[in-house]
UniProtKB/Swiss-Prot annotation:
Compositional bias of kind Basic residues: 113-123
One example GO MF annotation: tRNA binding
Gene3D superfamilies per record: Nucleic acid-binding proteins
GO cellular component labels: small ribosomal subunit
Organism of derivation: Ectopseudomonas mendocina (strain ymp)
Keyword field: Methylation, Ribonucleoprotein, Ribosomal protein, RNA-binding, rRNA-binding, tRNA-binding
Region (Disordered): 100-123
Highest taxon listed in the record's lineage: Bacteria
Name of the featured protein: Small ribosomal subunit protein uS12
Length: 123
């Protein structure tokens, strides 16, 4: 326990909270341009080809972003919106692309959980 004199000389340090999504700079989403669209394999117990794109954001950052849902229409130079949210089994992927906004189409034939995949209500 510190004495009062010690605390007067050097107050207690506040714990600084570090952001999980620094590239967003406290914004809910950011716009960017795809520089590369590719697939990658997940970490050890899992096996798949995960769809990922490299995005150059409007603030100059370049980040990897996961493309959720079945099938996508993204290619190089597509303009996308990204949000925070990491993919646990892909190291270095800390962002998600928002489906159904800008150049990213919604997931086709999606019936449930549509709002997360930018799909309109079926007639």
């Amino acid at each position: 326990m510190a004495t009062i004199n010690q605390l007067v000389r050097q107050p207690r340090k506040r714990i600084v909270e570090k952001s999980d999504v620094p590239a967003l700079q406290n914004c809910p989403q950011r716009r960017g341009v795809c520089t590369r669209v590719y697939t990658t394999t997940p970490k050890k117990p899992n096996s798949a080809l995960r769809k990922v794109c490299r995005v150059r954001l409007t603030n100059g950052y370049e980040v990897s972003s996961y493309i959720g849902g079945e099938g996508h229409n993204l290619q190089e130079h597509s303009v996308v919106l990204i949000r925070g949210g990491r993919v646990k089994d892909l190291p270095g992927v800390r962002y998600h692309t928002v489906r159904g906004s800008l150049d990213t189409s919604g997931v086709k034939d999606r019936k449930q959980g549509r709002s997360k995949y930018g799909t309109k209500r079926p007639k």
